[in-house]
Amino acid sequence: MGQSKSKPREKKEEEKSTTTLVTKSKEKVMEKEAKQSDKESQPAESLLFATSKHSRPSSSSEDKPETKQRSSKKRSVIPQIIITRASNETLISYGIPDNDEQRTIREHADWGPYHRHRSPSTIAAYDVHNTE
């Protein structure tokens, strides 16, 4: 019997909720129309505000003049690239014979047990070297 009493109450609550939903939806429509009229009157400002809002979300109107002054004070130095060509100078050495041996760098013949690792070929690395 207690259950039959609660059923009519639920119907009354549903009726109340439908009326409140209708009034809320009408209010939302009115708010949207008001917002659209504001957007139509100032489309350029809203676009500029939206782009600045995305780039700097926490910036205020007071910070903007300060940043402009800072950027005007700091002047960056642009590096200059100078393209040159190869020099025509030659290296002249006096008193030394013009030999290929003098121009190449040769390692010492006696490196001890590590001599085989200094050779560039793998076959020479496994050759037995007797320097004694």
Curated annotation (Swiss-Prot):
Protein's GO biological process: fertilization; flagellated sperm motility; mitophagy; protein localization
Region (Interaction with ATG16L1), start-end ranges = 1-60
The ranges of region (Interaction with VDAC2) come to 61-132
Q: Please tell me in which tissues this protein is expressed.
A: Predominantly expressed in the testis (at protein level). Expressed in the sperm midpiece (at protein level).
**PQIIIT (motif): residue ranges:** 79-84
GO MF, one example: protein-containing complex binding
Q: Show the segment(s) annotated as Disordered.
A: 1-81, 110-132
Keywords annotated in UniProt: Autophagy, Cytoplasm, Mitochondrion, Nucleus, Phosphoprotein
Query: Where in the sequence is Phosphoserine found?
Result: S87
From the Swiss-Prot or TrEMBL record, state where the protein is found: Cytoplasm, Cytosol; Nucleus; Cytoplasm; Mitochondrion
One GO cellular component term of this record is: sperm mitochondrial sheath
Write down a Pfam family by its short name.
DUF4609
Basic and acidic residues compositional bias, start-end: 24-42
Knockout phenotype, as recorded, reads:
Mice exhibit reduced sperm motility because of an inflexible midpiece, leading to impaired male fertility. Spata33 knockout in Sertoli cells and spermatogenic cells suppresses mitophagy.
Q: Which InterPro entries match?
A: DUF4609
SUBUNIT field: Interacts (via PQIIIT motif) with PPP3R2 and PPP3CC. Interacts with VDAC2. Interacts with ATG16L1 (via WD repeats). Interacts with PPP3R1, PPP3CA and PPP3CB.
Q: What does this protein do?
A: Plays an important role in sperm motility and male fertility. Required for sperm midpiece flexibility and for the localization of sperm calcineurin to the mitochondria. Promotes mitophagy as well as acts as an autophagy mediator in male germline cells. Links damaged mitochondria to autophagosomes via its binding to the outer mitochondrial membrane protein VDAC2, as well as to key autophagy machinery component ATG16L1.
- Name assigned to this protein: Spermatogenesis-associated protein 33
